[in-house]
Amino acid sequence: MANQDIYANLTQLGGKTELPNSPEEAVLEKVPNPQAGTDYAVRFTAPEFTSLCPLTAQPDFAHIVIDYVPGDWLVESKSLKLYLGSFRNHGAFHEDCSVSIGKRLVELLAPKWLRVGAYWYPRGGIPIDVFYQTGPELPGVWIPDQGVPTYRGRG
């Protein structure tokens, strides 16, 4: 069994936690990477991400895929879920939401590599896809295609 002391600083895992009111209030937590000497990819998929249009307050929906190659740290998944959920009542344009997620994770984790693909569902007839990446993929690490097809409507 892993040394439980390395998880002592986690405040959200293992108990009831309220959804934060905004991304700024959300607490992202990290844990030590037990495989820090090995390069490998981690993927999180949020197919029902929501935020609000900052002008109309109408809901916006996206399928978000986060891929990263961790260094010394892993993001704690419940804190990531709560962070992503905190956008539900947050007003921001698609581009801002998408890039902010990537930058916040980079700031927290200092990963070797990170990519966010945000595939926004159409509103006003125009789908918007936003991509953020910290640099080229690492040699020798398998990074699968994100698997989200271009929106075609009834096409």
Swiss-Prot record:
EC identifiers of the protein: 1.7.1.13
Pathway membership: tRNA modification; tRNA-queuosine biosynthesis
Keyword NADP recorded: yes
Catalytic activity as recorded in UniProt: 7-aminomethyl-7-carbaguanine + 2 NADP(+) = 7-cyano-7-deazaguanine + 2 NADPH + 3 H(+)
GO molecular function, one term: preQ1 synthase activity
Chief localization: cytoplasm
Record SUPFAM superfamilies: Tetrahydrobiopterin biosynthesis enzymes-like
Family matches, as InterPro entries: GTP-CH-I_C/QueF, NADPH_dep_7-cyano-7-deazaG_red, QueF, QueF_type1
Protein origin, superkingdom: Bacteria
Active site: 53 (thioimide intermediate), 60 (proton donor)
The keyword NADP belongs to this UniProt entry's keyword annotation: yes
Keyword terms: Cytoplasm, NADP, Oxidoreductase, Queuosine biosynthesis
GO cellular component: cytoplasm
Entry's family note: Belongs to the GTP cyclohydrolase I family. QueF type 1 subfamily.
PANTHER family (UniProt xref): NADPH-DEPENDENT 7-CYANO-7-DEAZAGUANINE REDUCTASE
Purpose: Catalyzes the NADPH-dependent reduction of 7-cyano-7-deazaguanine (preQ0) to 7-aminomethyl-7-deazaguanine (preQ1).
The protein, known as: NADPH-dependent 7-cyano-7-deazaguanine reductase
Natural source organism: Ruegeria pomeroyi (strain ATCC 700808 / DSM 15171 / DSS-3) (Silicibacter pomeroyi)
